[in-house]
From Swiss-Prot:
One of its GO terms (cellular component) is extracellular region. The keyword Repressor does not apply. This is Thaumatin-like protein 1a. Keywords: Allergen, Disulfide bond, Secreted, Signal. Pfam families: Thaumatin. Residues 1-24 form the signal peptide. Disulfide bonds join C33-C245, C81-C91, C96-C103, C151-C234, C156-C217, C164-C180, C184-C193, C194-C204. The keyword Disulfide bond applies. InterPro entries: Osmotin/thaumatin-like_sf (IPR037176), Thaumatin (IPR001938), Thaumatin_CS (IPR017949). Belongs to the thaumatin family.
Length: 246
């Protein structure tokens, strides 16, 4: 192929990418917790996983991964992790069950605090949130870097484990509370899970348990229909910083 043809094809490809709004969002994870966290990533819609699906992040360390556009998925932090004599890697909270540091397309086992991001969903607009719908294991926040529009940070900075009701508590061997179940996970009742026949906002209002999450972290999803102040938007192809223990 002639050099001019190669150059033309390259230019056309770049133009298509530019005008279609393609933008790889840089997602940076920062660990402000006093202990090591093992972030996990999961791409939704049965799309290819990111280049990093799980890794170790020491206290005060940061690491980044690129997410293509469009993209949708979730992020979480595993804690109290170890490798046994047989080489199997497990975590006491938010484990993904892969037996490895990499999650390889497996999601977090609840309870787990989640950050959810959808990149370039409608007309290039991003949606993002912190969710306690699957319970809580550690504080998290997500903040756009750049972009246009509101682009406000979403955060759950409180340690919900400290106020977790007894029926929702998950304890370590030493008796300390290490995560807090959602009422849905703890009881399996449709009034907590917002499943039929309680699968509308009208038939699945907040409960005494979701209101504990709401009080501690008003910017986060406390249960399935907590949309009013929990979904955030940003346009213009921002990058994101996800912080553990913000």
């Amino acid at each position: 192929m002639m050099k001019s043809q190669v150059a033309s094809l390259l230019g056309l490809t770049l133009a298509i990418l530019f005008f279609s709004g393609a933008h790889a969002a840089k997602i940076t994870f920062t660990n402000n917790c006093p202990n090591t966290v093992w972030p996990g990533t999961l791409t939704g819609d049965q799309k290819p996983q990111l280049s990093l699906t799980g890794f170790e992040l020491a206290s005060k360390a940061s690491r980044s991964v690129d997410a293509p556009s469009p993209w949708s998925g979730r992020f979480w932090g595993r804690t109290r992790c170890s490798t046994d004599a047989a080489g199997k890697f497990t975590c006491e909270t938010a484990d993904c069950g892969s037996g490895q540091v990499a999650c390889n397309g497996a999601g977090a086992v609840p309870p787990a605090t989640l950050v959810e991001i959808t990149i370039a969903a409608n007309g290039g607009q991003d949606y993002y949130d912190v969710s306690l719908v699957d319970g809580f294991n550690l504080p998290m926040s997500v903040a756009p870097q750049g972009g246009t529009g509101e682009c406000k940070p979403s955060s759950c900075p409180a340690n919900v484990n400290k106020v977790c009701p007894a029926p929702l508590q998950v304890k370590a061997a030493d008796g300390s509370v290490i995560s807090c179940k959602s009422a849905c996970l703890a009881f399996g009742d449709s009034k907590y899970c917002c499943t039929p026949p309680n699968n509308t906002p009208e038939t699945c209002p907040p409960t005494e348990y979701s209101e504990i999450f709401e009080k501690q972290c008003p910017q986060a999803y406390s249960y399935a229909y907590d949309d009013k102040n929990s979904t955030f938007t940003c346009s213009g192809g921002p990058d994101y910083v996800i912080t553990f223990c913000p």
